[in-house]
Each structure stands twice: as C-alpha cells, then as structure tokens.
C-alpha cells in the first residue's frame, strides 16, 4: 500500500465527480492536495471540504495551461508526488453529424493533449529534482470498446478521445519504462457524476445492466489499483466482456483470410 503521508498530489477535473472523490480519498490517506478545474466555483467548493487543500482555476484546453499548472503545483510545497490527470469533457453529437469545430477540437485538447502536456512537463521536473513520481490518467470504458451500455448514444467523438488516451498512455509506458515515473490508466464504467445526474436524477432508478457506481467507489478502486501497481485500472467487470467482439472479429477475419494456422 502506498504511503501518502506528507506527499503532494495534483488532481485535475476536481470540481465534482471522480476528481472530487479522488482528492478527498487522497487526503484521507495523508496527501496534501492541489485541485484544478475550469469551474472556479466548483473547485473552490471541493477545496472547502478538504483541510489544507489549494484550488486553482485553469482551462487545460489552453496549450500553455498544463505545463504552467504542473510548475505551480510543484512550487506549492516544493514537491509533486502524484498527478491525477482526470479532467475531461464530453460530447453529444452523432459522428456523422459532428462538425469539426471548436467544440470538437476542445474534446481532443482536454481529453488527450492536456494529459500529454502534463506528462511532458512533469517528467523533466522529476528528472531535475531526482524524485520519483506517479501519474494516473482517467480514461473510460470507452477506451477499450464501444460498450453495450452506450450503444445508440451520441458519444462517438468522446469515445474516440478515450481510445486515443489509452493508446497514448500505452506508448508512454513503453517510452518511459526506464524513467522515474509510474503510469496508470483509470478506466471507469458508469459513475454517477454530474453529467450522468443530468440524464438520471435518481441513481436508484439506473438500469441494473448499467452497473452504476458512486464516485467514491471509483476513487477507492483507483487508489487500490495504484497500490497494486496496476497500469490498467478498470472499475467494472463488464469491460473485459465489452472487448470480446473486437478480438473475436479480428480472429474471425484472420480465419476467413486464411492467415492463421489451422489446428
């Protein structure tokens, strides 16, 4: 189990939902937490629930914001042991109708490129100070597949960003295998965040197949996954089943093309 006593953690997307729960869980384990979110009132509200927390309002879609945030977080206490790169935005347009506009570009800017810019700022800091760090990116069940629970919804571009985030994290894991940083990818299924609450005000009425969990449970799984040193941190058992159609489809195509040895 990781000893967070005296450590400093930065949590982005901390105004609500998973980010807020991660910040509270890390504080409960002994960490000092810096919170960041584009929602200034929300992130200050979260900070008010955590003794000693520091809140920053920033828009990670701004190319200079991720690096500046990492520097500010390090300067706060002179160390930065963990970053939970959790900030993300959603979308609700069918891909066939999705214009490549500012909203589409913002999806990739926040969900993918901000996470990369955070790593690019964090690693040199660790190398400069001789410290070892830890970084967890928040992906999604949509990082792995088109989950059964969301088929028919209009979140295709969001799903594409979460696929991209996972592949990027896997490449970083390979590139940084000798670097002083431990990487993790949290892949939540259905979590009762404010975004979900707008469509489903009463969580007790969620369809059982959705497997809806509270943000606090998601944070508990996330910290347990880091304790265990896991790179992939899924929150729902169905994620493995959701991946099966893709792998089976590729296997069937190889058979049809005669590209797999028989027997």
Explain the meaning of each model-derived region.
Residues 29-45:
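Conserved glycine-rich Rossmann-like NAD(P)H-binding loop of the short-chain dehydrogenase/reductase
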Residues 67, 90-105, 148-151:
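Conserved mid-core segment of classical short-chain dehydrogenase/reductases
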Residues 136-164, 169-170, 174-177, 190:
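Catalytic loop of short-chain dehydrogenase/reductase
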Residues 185, 201, 205-242:
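C-terminal helical subdomain
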Residues 7, 79-80, 126-141, 178-181:
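Active-site loop of short-chain dehydrogenase/reductase
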Residues 2-34:
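Canonical Rossmann dinucleotide-binding motif of NAD(H)/NADP(H)-dependent dehydrogenases/reductases
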Residues 40-41, 56-68, 101:
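The beta1-alpha1 cofactor-binding region of Rossmann-like NAD(H)/NADP(H)-dependent oxidoreductases
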């Amino acid at each position: 189990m990781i000893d967070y006593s005296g450590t400093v953690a930065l949590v982005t997307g901390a105004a609500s939902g998973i980010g807020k729960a991660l910040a509270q869980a890390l504080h409960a384990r002994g960490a000092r937490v810096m919170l960041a979110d584009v929602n200034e009132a929300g992130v200050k509200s979260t900070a008010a629930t955590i003794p000693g927390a520091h809140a920053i309002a920033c828009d990670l879609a701004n190319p200079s914001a991720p690096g500046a945030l990492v520097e500010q977080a390090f300067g706060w206490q002179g160390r930065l042991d963990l970053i939970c790169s959790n900030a993300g935005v959603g979308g609700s347009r069918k891909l066939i109708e999705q214009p490549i506009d500012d909203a589409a570009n913002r999806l990739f800017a926040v969900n993918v490129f901000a996470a990369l810019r955070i790593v690019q700022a964090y690693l040199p800091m660790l190398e400069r100070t001789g410290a070892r760090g830890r970084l967890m990116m928040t992906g999604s069940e949509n990082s792995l597949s088109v989950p059964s629970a969301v088929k028919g919804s209009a979140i295709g571009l969001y799903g594409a960003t979460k696929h991209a985030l996972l592949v990027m994290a896997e490449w970083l894991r390979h590139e940084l295998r000798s670097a002083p940083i431990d990487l993790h990818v949290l892949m939540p299924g259905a979590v009762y965040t404010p975004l979900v609450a707008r469509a489903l005000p009463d969580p007790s009425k969620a369809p059982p197949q959705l497997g809806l969990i509270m943000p606090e449970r998601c944070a508990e799984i996330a910290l347990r996954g880091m304790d265990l040193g896991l790179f992939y941190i899924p929150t729902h058992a169905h994620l493995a089943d959701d991946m099966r159609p893709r792998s089976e489809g590729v296997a069937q195509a190889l058979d049809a093309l005669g590209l797999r040895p028989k027997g």
